[in-house]
């Protein structure tokens, strides 16, 4: 739903695009985070009603990340199916200079996902051992170490 007549509906820019591009509603200046402790709000002028069982994920366009020092303040935005407010992006400028986002500029993408229902069940015994074990951030590094919970006395 357009909240402003100037809003541009999200659009898949190519036939195989996974995300829908989001457009900036107004020309917006994003101050360097060196000079501001608050994120800048980028308005889209849009609101939506997702079907029950779905959510939207907001991510920066890769070209925005490549060409600027702008980042989403929360790294990724999540829009729940029961949210009815404006779709907004909270942006930080990690660079040294002011960044201008022009009206109508594509800055982020919205991906729509189906929620998979899961049931969380507390383990009452132990978890199975795997080749990776408990090594965090170790895949492909060939540490050769395998730690189990028994070895850690957890």
Which stretches of residues belong to each language-model region?
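DUTPase catalytic domain/fold
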Residues: 1-154
């Amino acid at each position: 739903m357009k909240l402003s007549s100037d809003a541009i509906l999200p659009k898949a820019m190519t036939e195989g695009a996974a995300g829908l591009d989001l457009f900036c509603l107004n020309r917006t200046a994003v101050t360097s985070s060196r000079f501001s402790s608050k994120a800048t709000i980028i308005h889209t002028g849009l609101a939506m009603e997702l079907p029950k069982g779905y959510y939207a994920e907001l991510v920066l366009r890769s070209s925005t990340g490549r060409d600027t020092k702008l980042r989403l303040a929360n790294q990724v935005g999540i829009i729940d199916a029961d949210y009815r407010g404006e779709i907004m992006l909270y942006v930080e400028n990690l660079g040294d200079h002011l960044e201008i986002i022009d009206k109508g500029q594509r800055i982020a993408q919205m991906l729509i996902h189906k929620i998979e229902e899961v049931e969380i069940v507390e383990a009452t015994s132990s978890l199975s051992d795997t080749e990776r074990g408990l090594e965090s951030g170790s895949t492909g590094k060939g540490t050769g170490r395998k730690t189990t919970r028994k070895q850690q006395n957890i």
